[in-house]
Amino acid sequence: MDHVKLVNDPIDIAHIHQLLADEGCGASSVFVGTTRDNFQGKKVLSLAYEAYDSMALKEMNKICSDLRSKWLDLKHIVIYHRLGTVPVCQASVVIAASSPHRSEALESVSFAIDQLKTRVPIWKKEIYEGDNDSEWKENKESIRPKKSKSGFNYAACPCKVEESHDVPRTLVQIRVNDAELAKRLECFVNRKRDEINSQNVIDFKSSFVSSDKDLSDSCARTQSTIIKQEQSNCHLKVRRVNNRCGPQQMEMRPNYELELNKLMGSRDGQTDPTKEMRKSLPNSRLQAIESYMGLTTDNEENIFSRIKRVENRLLQLESISPEYRHFTKREPSSMEAAPPKKIRKKSYSAQELSAFIQKVKDGSEFS
């Protein structure tokens, strides 16, 4: 069993031994980290520990899982860390493990100590005696990235400015004194703050409030009404729309086009655009196209403008749905000439060619 805890009181070592006790275990290894009274010649009075509790517990549980994956015979694992002020000689951390054999217990505890120092977000502050200031200690074993040593050191390269040098007025964008500049900055910050507050009211505050209440001092923090949506990390409500018809069904319904063809097949013979075209005036062909496209017909309008509107309508229909094809079926025109038929040339044998040549020589072919 895993026992992971962050405590603010002194750690009871006897209680740790009770957690490790098991009839099937022949070895228990316990590490106790305590506060020492000196550091580099300075007298240490105590240590102060702070932690990111939720993340620290999560990492400590991960360490327990890693231990069990490496040493399968481990029975009980204990990781206790104390927070707050820890005086000299008192325990700040206890790591213990029990197993049937001593090798697994010793190796697992040693591994857990190194992982705790490397991965768990716990910070230590040393409090010294006398005039020495307290100091937060850097964890040199941490795997978190540190500042790059190759970064540019601006302090080592000070910029010298000659006060006597006059800057051209063309290079100065703002020509006001410090008071006016501070006033402008304050106005800008206040305006951005008002914009954020108004947006928070729109996103978070309830619109169903009584008009008799004074809401001049209200804000989203005190009167927030939005409830977090289930299975979502967003506070705004999200809806999923499933279109039962249209081009989006092409992927979800493989037979959509076939079903559409069957459904619209009965309507194909209801109207015959060619009959109307033959009966109407010379521009009747364009009028028929406009009627099928759902466009209003104006005979006084320029014909090129009407054709342009028809083209735009076709592009729109092509972009939104394939159904338009059933309303604009192209029929072959009776005025179009039929394509020429292919004529297969006759093949002659050698005897037929010889007879034909002989007839030409005799002149009987032309007589």
Curated annotation (Swiss-Prot):
Documented EC number(s): 2.8.1.12
Region span, Disordered: 326-345
Functional pathway: Cofactor biosynthesis; molybdopterin biosynthesis
GO biological-process terms attached to the record: chromatin remodeling; Mo-molybdopterin cofactor biosynthetic process
Major localisation: cytoplasm
Record-linked InterPro entries: MoaE_sf, MOCS2B_euk, Mopterin_biosynth_MoaE
Entry keyword annotation includes Plastid: no
Catalytic activity: 2 [molybdopterin-synthase sulfur-carrier protein]-C-terminal-Gly-aminoethanethioate + cyclic pyranopterin phosphate + H2O = molybdopterin + 2 [molybdopterin-synthase sulfur-carrier protein]-C-terminal Gly-Gly + 2 H(+)
Compartments in which it is found: Cytoplasm
Note: This protein is produced by a bicistronic gene which also produces the small subunit (Mocs2A).
Function field: Catalytic subunit of the molybdopterin synthase complex, a complex that catalyzes the conversion of precursor Z into molybdopterin. Acts by mediating the incorporation of 2 sulfur atoms from thiocarboxylated Mocs2A into precursor Z to generate a dithiolene group.
Official protein name in the record: Molybdopterin synthase catalytic subunit
Organism, as annotated: Drosophila sechellia (Fruit fly)
Lineage: Eukaryota, Metazoa, Ecdysozoa, Arthropoda, Hexapoda
Gene designation per UniProt: Mocs2B
